[in-house]
Swiss-Prot record:
Single GO biological process annotation from the record: mitochondrial translation
Keyword annotations of the record: ATP-binding, Ligase, Mitochondrion, Nucleotide-binding, Protein biosynthesis, Transit peptide
Quaternary organization: Subunit of the heterotrimeric GatCAB amidotransferase (AdT) complex, composed of A, B and C subunits.
Species in which this protein is naturally found: Cryptococcus neoformans var. neoformans serotype D (strain JEC21 / ATCC MYA-565) (Filobasidiella neoformans)
Transit peptide feature range: 1-22
GO CC terms in record: glutamyl-tRNA(Gln) amidotransferase complex; mitochondrion
EC number: 6.3.5.-
SMART domains (UniProt xref): GatB_Yqey (SM00845)
PROSITE patterns linked: GATB
One annotated GO molecular function: ATP binding
Name the UniProt record assigns to this protein: Glutamyl-tRNA(Gln) amidotransferase subunit B, mitochondrial
Length: 521
């Protein structure tokens, strides 16, 4: 269970320590430099309402319509904590292998700006919800060249700010986002390349969606990334750290890191005696370069203090155990299991995973199609990931598990594999399903479906198939001549002609055998 108690003595946390190093003026290029990267990620919690009020968090509404009196900081209003936001945050922390703080508290971070109506933000400075976790990055993830763990320093729950926009001399403020619950996830500076940072963000997005705690949509601002970058010579202390704020895509994250990395190296190579200024920087998406926002040489005094209006959060072991048992299979675990159990490729497994990142319907659909018959697993993957999704792509239609019901897809795959129907017939069936409206009723059995479409397997005799093969040879004299000259691959062109003449009903393998016999006579 989660219990809420009045706040007590707060425990300050120790800040990360970063130091500087310098290069000599004779050093050229970026070889021999090591980049150090740490991330601060803000993910909006997917509860449908704000952290301390009942206002909606729906995206795209008219400005200043999703606002409660507490979000606008009306005097006398009190925060009411959404316990579901805490539950989802704890599940995220468990998935990140974090230690859960048995007693966490809320604090006020004071500053004056347009986007903070109360002039303070409710956060967790002294006693965060969780800490000391990690997320493993595998070699090959987003181009990562090593397998390693990225440490999670802490996960804390806090309020999001409003949006503000400067128009001429005026500043327009939209309070729709103000008060939305955020998980702030702070990593240790364990990443050494833009690709590793991108791999972490991508993996975290999948984790958040599978847990159900956040959408992780960077384009909508549901997930925002601040990145800290420094460079140094191997074996030397870390260089001066600069922070790049509010990056909204993985591609831009990697470009921002590379731009900042090159800027630091250029400074140390050209001005080795001049300290690099510690700054907060922005990122220009057009030039793919960072630019200075403000100096960070002096730490801002936010005058943190415990929030008297909010009780402490007390979490017992029994509640944690129940959440741990209900954690879903993580995306990378699903991919590994499919590869190991069914022998499918990692790429195809990731394609199935991508059909539904939230509840893994694509993987459940695949396993229902296979019905524990590992012999057809690879073929089933081909039919789903390539044929079905290919047809859906042409029709500009999203995948759902009802377009081709799993039992019918299972019968289709097994029928093709047992040569009851041809691959051409199977493709025609898939195309038929894709063309049907969602409300269309389906035949009760696979046999009736074939009959309805006029695709019932032909019971033609060997003699009939031989006659069809002879017609195909007459229609393709050049292919016959090429075969006689030693080009045996052209037999497949003749098989295609047989399938065309038979309306796709002929057995392609039998047709090939007969054609080879006829061609060698």
């Amino acid at each position: 269970m989660i219990a809420l108690l009045r706040w007590g003595i707060a425990r300050p946390s120790a800040p990360l320590r970063w130091s500087r190093c310098f290069a000599t003026s004779t050093e050229k290029g970026d070889e021999g430099w090591q980049t150090v990267i740490g991330l601060e990620i803000h993910a909006q919690i997917k509860t449908g309402k704000k952290l301390f009020s009942k206002a909606s968090t729906s995206y795209g509404h008219v400005p200043n319509t999703n606002v409660d009196v507490h979000d606008a900081a009306f005097p006398g209003t009190l925060p009411v904590l959404d316990i579901n936001a805490i539950r989802l945050s704890i599940m995220t922390a468990l998935a990140l292998n974090c230690q859960i703080n048995p007693r966490s508290t809320f604090d006020r971070k004071h500053y004056f700006y347009h986007d903070i109506p109360a002039s303070y933000q409710i956060t967790q400075h002294y006693n965060p919800l969780a800490w000391n976790g990690h997320l493993e990055i595998r070699e090959g993830d987003n181009g990562s060249k090593r397998t390693f763990n990225i440490g999670i320093k802490q996960l804390q729950v806090e309020q999001d700010t409003a949006k503000s926009q400067t128009v001429g001399d005026a500043v327009l403020v939209d309070l729709n986002r103000a008060g939305t619950g955020l998980m702030e996830i702070v990593t240790d500076p364990d990443m050494r390349s833009p690709e590793e940072a991108g791999a972490f963000v991508k993996k975290l997005q999948g984790l958040l969606r599978r847990v159900g705690s956040a959408d992780g949509d960077m384009e909508k601002g549901n997930l925002r990334v601040d990145v800290n970058v420094s460079v140094h010579r191997p074996g030397m202390p870390f260089g001066t750290r600069c922070e790049i704020k509010n990056i909204n895509s993985v591609r831009f994250l990697q470009a921002a890191i590379e731009s900042e990395r090159q800027r630091h190296i250029a400074h140390y190579c050209t001005s080795p005696l001049e300290p690099l200024a510690q700054e907060t920087r922005g990122f220009n998406e057009l030039t793919l370069q960072t630019y200075s926002l403000r100096s960070k040489e002096e730490a801002t005094d936010y005058r943190y203090m415990p929030d008297h209006n909010l009780p402490a959060i007390i979490i017992d072991d029994g509640y944690l155990d129940s959440l741990w048992k209900n954690l879903p299979e993580m995306p990378w675990q699903s991919v590994e299991r499919l590869v190991k159990t069914y022998g499918v490729t990692k790429r195809d497994a990731e394609t199935l995973l991508g059909l539904d990142e939230y509840s893994a319907q694509g993987i459940a659909y695949f396993e229902e199609v296979v019905e524990q018959d590992k012999k057809i697993a690879k073929k089933a993957t081909n039919w789903i990931a390539h044929e079905l999704l290919g047809q859906l792509g042409k029709a500009i239609r999203p995948w759902t598990p009802t377009i081709v019901p799993a039992p019918l897809m299972h019968e289709l795959v097994t029928a093709v594999e047992s040569r009851e129907i041809t691959g051409t017939t199977g493709k025609a069936i898939v195309k038929h399903f894709v063309s049907l409206p969602e409300s269309a009723s389906l035949p009760p059995s696979f046999a009736e479906l074939l009959a309805e479409l006029g695709l019932t397997p032909s019971a033609a005799s060997v003699e009939d198939l031989t006659e069809t093969c002879k017609k195909a040879m007459n229609n393709q004299p050049k292919a016959v001549a090429d075969f006689k000259k030693g080009n045996e691959k052209v037999v497949m062109r003749l098989v295609g002609e047989v399938m065309k003449l038979s309306g796709g009903k002929a057995d392609a393998m039998k047709a090939k055998d007969i054609l080879l016999d006829l061609l060698k006579d």
